[in-house]
Amino acid sequence: MLGLGTLARKIFGTPNDRKVKSVRSLVARINELETEFQALSDEGIKQKTAEFQRRVQEGGESLDDLLPEAFANCREGARRALGLRAFDVQLMGGIFLHQGNIAEMKTGEGKTLVATFPAYLNALAGKGVHVVTVNDYLAKRDSEWMGKVYAQLGLTTGVVYPFQSEEEKKAAYRADITYATNNELGFDYLRDNMKASKEEMKQRGHFFAIVDEVDSILIDEARTPLIISGPSQDRSDLYTKVDKLIPELVEEHYKLDEKTRNVTFTEEGNEFLETRLHETGLLPEGQSLYDPESTTIVHHVNQGLRAHKLFHRDQQYIVRNDEIMLIDEFTGRMMRGRRLSDGLHQAIEAKEGVSIQPENVTLASVTFQNYFRLYDKLGGMTGTAATEAEEFMEIYGLGVVEVPTNRPVARTDEHDAVYRTAREKNDGIVASIKEAHERGQPILVGTTSIDKSEALSELLKAAGIPHNVLNARQHEQEAQIVADAGKPGAVTIATNMAGRGTDIQLGGNVEMKVMQALAADPTAHPDEIRARIEAEHAEEKQKVIDAGGLFVLGTERHESRRIDNQLRGRSGRQGDPGRSAFFLSLEDDLMRIFGSDRLDKVLSTLGMKDGEAIVHPWVNKSLEKAQAKVEARNFDIRKQLLKFDDVMNDQRKAIFSQRLEIMEAEDLSDIAQDMRYQVIDDLIDMHMPPKSYSDQWDIEGMHRAVMDKLGLDAPLAKWAQEEGVDQDVVRERLCEAADRQIADKTAAFGPETMRSIEKQILLQAIDAKWREHLLTLEHLRSVVGFRGYAQRDPLSEYKTEAFALFESMLNSLRQDVTQKLAQVRPLSEEEQQAVMRQFLDQQRTAAEAPASVPQPQAAVAPQPAPELVGADNGESQPQAWGDVARNDPCPCGSGLKYKHCHGRLD
């Protein structure tokens, strides 16, 4: 008997069925227009684009109303440029993307072509469209390939990648459609908000983004902050000394939690550490680990412990050319230029004995969650999103629609085979691979880490089975290995989803074979080469089909069902036959850490002998329940982190918005004046409290503060003795005196120069104070969790204190700007030019430095913003400066190096 839910679905269809049905009329309308657009000349297609742009930008026609015509024009453009006619299901995918959904489309269904339809339609608005991919190779490949379609339609295409010149990057963002990686988009956003002028900014807004492999970017990497950072002091000797202590620890000294990937010292461990740190001199005698002064050394020791117990060579990182290269846990690729933050990368460098690079301090940061929520509209594509539908809707407001396949999926998904030990499992894997290889069936073997892929490779070598290994070490050969993976009998071992974004075609990749043949014999006729290779390919493809298609063999289950489904999805593309199976053992990480008692009972009920695998639907269900629990826990973590990050995000948006207004403004004298007046108000409130009498005022303290903050030697003691002088009178006189001082400086500098100095001082102060604020918030966030022990909500505490810190930062900003403007003095024209050049160069260096994405947090490299122009910070007392390095900024505040200023050798 059918359940009520099943019966209702049979009668009314699922919500997904209804969504698909709702766009069929639009697809029918596009098909009706096909002959009309086929009749157009090439020039006629471009004229249609120009007509559409006028209708949208000048006539106010909505993109929804224009959709059928625009899609019909795009389909014809793609047919002429690439020889590809989009299927109805591809049009559906394009419609769902335009509507701000995630289109779940299986591997091989042509997602790259699907993106051209909503990209073309939305580009007609003239605000730019970003197509987001997971790596630079795919961004360049797709922009070149689909750029032919956009050129046919009369639109421009750009591609953004690291280390481009300023002009190239700016031109790419000015194109109608821009291809880029999620990392580069996020970093350019941060860099733009560190620029000295609006003209230097590259991005022109966030109108519409289409995110390819959306699950990887918005779910897997959601917790990853993008951080641009600058160098701090070198502590490499401290890391080395701490690293020597870690191997002395025994198991009783620390507690390792593999579920949460966390490790902490026990009470015994703390006692042992304190003793050893005293003996090595790292902790002064009489000082305890629990003293506030010990915070730094305790932090270093904790990072050393994490480096040894949580980060393992050939799993989370590899060592190459005296460097620690991080491995992306989701794709298995090397992450060049990325560094772990908070001293963790240095701890791993000390552990491996490679050169220790200096730590970095955060200059700017944003998470992918908050970056992509900047867009007015967002769409996404992936082969697997349904399992995370709730998260996409709750965090990003994105619905998930499963788009029907053009042909039915012919892949057979077998039940998991569970062995008792890893050795028995590996024997089963090798036997299964050997049997498929001998039948001529290509096999893709999925592993979870580099060391496991290489261990399996050794087993296959011992068994005499030829194979390729695709992991971070073979990153450069990825395209070739993937192209060969569909050949008869090919065996390919891949870490996680390495090679994702490139289809494995049965019989091998025709285009790759043609290119290689033409490269080998440039004199050959391309048509003859293609005809010969296509004939050979058809024969090889048939052999593979007869052998059962691509066999995907998973060697472990992942924490997420979605990652497992991605691996399965490499087989059975476009209706091809295929087969998938997972081989597991009770020693696998997931089974060991999350395997429930229920699974143990199931296996004992079914009976298990040595060397024998259990294959049963009960096992699958039990595993999926364990995975669902892990997914729910990870979702909760991401949700909670987002709530914390939203606090910083609101502040970030306020600061970046204010900074942009300052960059755009011609005259900032009113803002500077408001800041001066606020500083005067604050000083009066502090030293001359309301409702107090003049004999209660702190005249001496007020005089010192006015000299320090405003540079004014005001006769406050005399004013206080005058009849009828109250706080309002003092305020008025100080404001007038401060205004006269600035007016005199404006006359000395010239109005234009003074306006430029005001802008420069404001931007520098905002950048410096924001950097300090980020560091303070990081520290607050690292300790606020302990408030839970006092029955206080950490999030509420964080919000309250972060707001108070933000207000404090704004007060400090006002004081800093007011003080610098009061102290600024006229420089010679030559000095002014030198200072301005140095400021702009350092701004550019800071904004264009290679940045990085961390594993909890990380980044690389720009210099901190320079000290300010011409501020008079006690120039009259060089004897009080102490020893100044010749390359350091001169303490007089000129902005010049000491050797070019007061340290000049005459």
UniProtKB/Swiss-Prot annotation:
It catalyses: ATP + H2O + cellular proteinSide 1 = ADP + phosphate + cellular proteinSide 2. It is an enzyme of class 7 (translocase). GO terms for molecular function: ATP binding; metal ion binding; protein-exporting ATPase activity. Residues 846-862 have a biased composition (Low complexity). InterPro entries: Helicase_ATP-bd (IPR014001), Helicase_C-like (IPR001650), P-loop_NTPase (IPR027417), SEC_C_motif (IPR004027), SecA (IPR000185), SecA_CS (IPR020937), SecA_DEAD (IPR011115), SecA_motor_DEAD (IPR014018). ATP binds at Q90, G108, E109, G110, K111, T112, D503. It is found in: Cell inner membrane; Cytoplasm. Keywords: ATP-binding, Cell inner membrane, Cell membrane, Cytoplasm, Membrane, Metal-binding, Nucleotide-binding, Protein transport, Translocase, Translocation, Transport, Zinc. GO terms for biological process: intracellular protein transmembrane transport; protein import; protein targeting; protein transport by the Sec complex. GO terms for cellular component: cell envelope Sec protein transport complex; cytosol; plasma membrane. Zn(2+) binds at C890, C892, C901, H902. The keyword Cytoplasm applies. It holds the Pfam family SecA_DEAD. Its EC number is 7.4.2.8. Its cofactor is Zn(2+). Transmembrane segments: none annotated. The keyword Transmembrane does not apply. It is a peripheral membrane protein. Residues 845-882 are annotated as: Disordered. Monomer and homodimer. Part of the essential Sec protein translocation apparatus which comprises SecA, SecYEG and auxiliary proteins SecDF-YajC and YidC. Part of the Sec protein translocase complex. Interacts with the SecYEG preprotein conducting channel. Has a central role in coupling the hydrolysis of ATP to the transfer of proteins into and across the cell membrane, serving both as a receptor for the preprotein-SecB complex and as an ATP-driven molecular motor driving the stepwise translocation of polypeptide chains across the membrane. This is Protein translocase subunit SecA. It comes from Cereibacter sphaeroides (strain ATCC 17025 / ATH 2.4.3) (Rhodobacter sphaeroides). The lineage of its organism: Bacteria, Pseudomonadati, Pseudomonadota, Alphaproteobacteria, Rhodobacterales. The gene is secA.
